């Protein structure tokens, strides 16, 4: 299993998920092994309970999942929204790749 955690670090609630997607597009990728060998990818997008995912963010969340899934097309992609105390207006992305 290869974990990766990204934080939005935007300090602007309206940009938290777009910033995660931009970060993934620029820097995130499968580099340690051939992505074809993965059988499952788990994606969790977390926000503070006081700043939950809003309706306008759903499309960006879907793009994040699509981007991650596209790196390993044969893998099953499971995803969910979660909560994490202390994130404030930021979002956290947890990605677990497994064989």
Where are each of the predicted segments found?
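Tubulin/FtsZ superfamily GTPase core signature
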Residues: 1-99
């Amino acid at each position: 299993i290869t974990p990766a955690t990204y934080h939005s670090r935007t300090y602007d609630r309206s940009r938290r998920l777009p910033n995660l997607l931009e970060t993934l597009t620029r820097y995130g990728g499968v580099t340690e092994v051939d992505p074809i060998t993965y059988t499952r990818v788990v994606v969790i997008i977390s926000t503070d309970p006081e700043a939950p995912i809003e309706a306008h963010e759903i499309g960006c969340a879907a793009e994040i999942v699509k981007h991650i899934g596209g790196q390993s097309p044969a893998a099953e992609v499971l995803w969910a929204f979660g909560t994490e105390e202390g994130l404030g207006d930021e979002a956290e992305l947890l990605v677990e790749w497994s064989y």
